[in-house]
């Protein structure tokens, strides 16, 4: 039985140039598993805590105290001593030991980034010991479904320095018959979108997740460009049918919400109008503030006008009542995804199931901090007939764990960025390899991934 012989953490850089943590786990057989931990920009307040160096002896190492040497030390000096000598196959025992060792609800003592790095590296070392891919080790013989990708082709919100308030505008090739075809379709739309934006006088610089970041004057303008790009690429902007490509949104409305006024404000657009930027002078009468009910109605108008199939974080993380209203109103035709609402937490997911707050959950490993708890959240959601969307973070690395996780649990959907930036493309490349490995055993469900819409 291979045991953990050494655990070593180090500081590396993520896709934004910020420090993050990498962990190596080596067994007594000489096998090593390596994991890099991602980092989010738009984060839910109930997420497990990412430990940074501000206020510590390492504070001045990196800009803004964003180093992770405190978390690195916690791995090398505390966690390693507890886990070395244990079987590398005892994933749940190892995760529980780390959870108990930390002793806080948000993993704030040792850091969720420290704990997650070890948790994932252990799983990778175990898979390597058995000479099998990670998706097979985690998911067993039943791991065979390739996920339909949500491709974030236009960025806004916290992910881009532009005038667009909603954070992500994504395309989903629901009419595709394979993962490869889905990526081919998305590729054509992405490059046609670039041409459209250039023609309109917008730059084609990209945001954190590889999507374009133009200074559009409304969400509708963005959606119009997406629809046009889909058509020019030779596909149909629709939520179903042959060659159909649908649209998905991540509104990230917690970032727009004011707890005092109980209103949502399109802050970036408001600023552009108040500063009278070129092209925004005539927008003085545009509605910029919404109550929860008004925002739900606004989404309804978008759903009626555009081929929208999924809306993530359409309301703030504290607006449980609003989420339930939105799901009751639109859940029969649109996927209502909870991200900040549930933060991959099985306990919060239970509340969402009871209150019928959503019909899909976003799965982010670093929101909860261990592989075991992530697996519990996925299992609980699937039993409740909720769809699971495995997701990246805005701060990523070349690590491709989430690609394997999506296949391991047959989630049917993955959200991992646009058709640019190596940190995003790495996940798609990993999925293409998995598709090839599985061959005829693989299944790609396309529109069937939305079994939760009814």
Swiss-Prot record:
Active-site residues, as the UniProt record annotates them: 209, 364
Annotated keywords: Cytoplasm, Glycolysis, Lyase, Magnesium, Metal-binding, Secreted
InterPro entries associated with the record: Enolase, Enolase-like_C_sf, Enolase-like_N, Enolase_C, Enolase_CS, Enolase_N
Record field: transmembrane: none
GO molecular function terms listed in the Swiss-Prot or TrEMBL record: magnesium ion binding; phosphopyruvate hydratase activity
Residues holding Mg(2+): 250, 312, 339
Cofactor: Mg(2+)
Residues binding (2R)-2-phosphoglycerate: 167, 364, 393-394, 415
Family matches, as PROSITE patterns: ENOLASE
Example of a GO cellular component annotation carried by this entry: cell surface
Function comment: Catalyzes the reversible conversion of 2-phosphoglycerate (2-PG) into phosphoenolpyruvate (PEP). It is essential for the degradation of carbohydrates via glycolysis.
Annotated protein name in UniProt: Enolase
UniProt source species: Mycoplasmopsis agalactiae (strain NCTC 10123 / CIP 59.7 / PG2)
Gene field: eno
């Amino acid at each position: 039985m291979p045991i953990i012989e050494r655990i070593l953490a180090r500081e590396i850089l993520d896709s934004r140039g910020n420090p993050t943590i990498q962990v190596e786990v080596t067994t007594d057989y000489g096998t090593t598993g390596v994991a890099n931990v991602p980092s989010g920009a738009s984060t839910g307040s109930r997420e497990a805590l990412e430990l940074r160096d501000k206020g510590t002896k390492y504070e001045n190492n990196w800009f803004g105290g964003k180093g992770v040497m405190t978390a690195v030390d916690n791995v090398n000096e505390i966690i390693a001593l507890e886990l070395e000598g244990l079987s590398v196959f005892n994933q749940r025992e190892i995760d529980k030991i780390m959870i108990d060792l930390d002793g806080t609800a948000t993993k704030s003592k040792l850091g969720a980034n420290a704990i997650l790095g070890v948790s994932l590296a252990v799983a990778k070392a175990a898979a390597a010991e058995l000479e099998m891919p990670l998706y097979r080790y985690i998911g067993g013989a039943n791991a065979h479904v390739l996920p339909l990708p949500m491709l974030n082709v236009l960025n806004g919100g916290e992910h881009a320095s532009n005038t667009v308030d909603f954070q992500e505008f994504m395309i989903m090739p629901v009419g595709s018959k394979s993962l490869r075809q889905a990526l081919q379709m998305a590729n054509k739309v992405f490059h046609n979108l670039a041409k459209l934006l250039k023609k309109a006088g917008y730059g084609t610089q990209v945001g954190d997740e590889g999507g374009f970041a133009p200074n559009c004057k409304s969400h509708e303008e963005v959606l119009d460009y997406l629809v046009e790009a889909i058509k020019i690429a030779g596909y149909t902007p629709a939520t179903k049918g042959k060659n159909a490509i649908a649209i998905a949104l991540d509104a990230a409305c917690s970032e727009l919400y004011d707890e005092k006024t109980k209103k949502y404000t399109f802050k970036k657009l408001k600023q552009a109008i108040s500063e009278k930027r070129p092209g925004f002078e005539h927008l003085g009468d545009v509605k910029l503030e919404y109550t929860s009910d008004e925002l739900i109605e606004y989404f309804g108008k978008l759903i009626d006008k555009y081929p929208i199939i999924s809306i993530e974080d359409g309301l703030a993380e504290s607006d449980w009542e609003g989420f339930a209203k939105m799901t009751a109103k639109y859940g029969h035709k649109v996927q209502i995804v909870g991200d900040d609402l549930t933060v991959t937490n099985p306990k919060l997911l239970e509340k969402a199931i009871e209150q019928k707050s959503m019909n899909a959950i976003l799965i982010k490993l670093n929101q909860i901090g261990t592989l075991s708890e992530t697996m519990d959240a996925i299992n609980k959601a699937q039993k409740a007939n909720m769809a699971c969307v495995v997701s990246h973070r805005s701060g990523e690395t070349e690590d491709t764990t989430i690609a394997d996780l999506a296949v391991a649990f047959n989630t049917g959907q993955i959200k991992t960025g646009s058709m640019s930036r190596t940190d995003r493309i790495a996940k798609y490349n990993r999925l293409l390899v998995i598709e090839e490995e599985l061959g005829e055993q693989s299944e790609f469900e396309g529109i069937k991934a939305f079994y939760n819409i009814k």
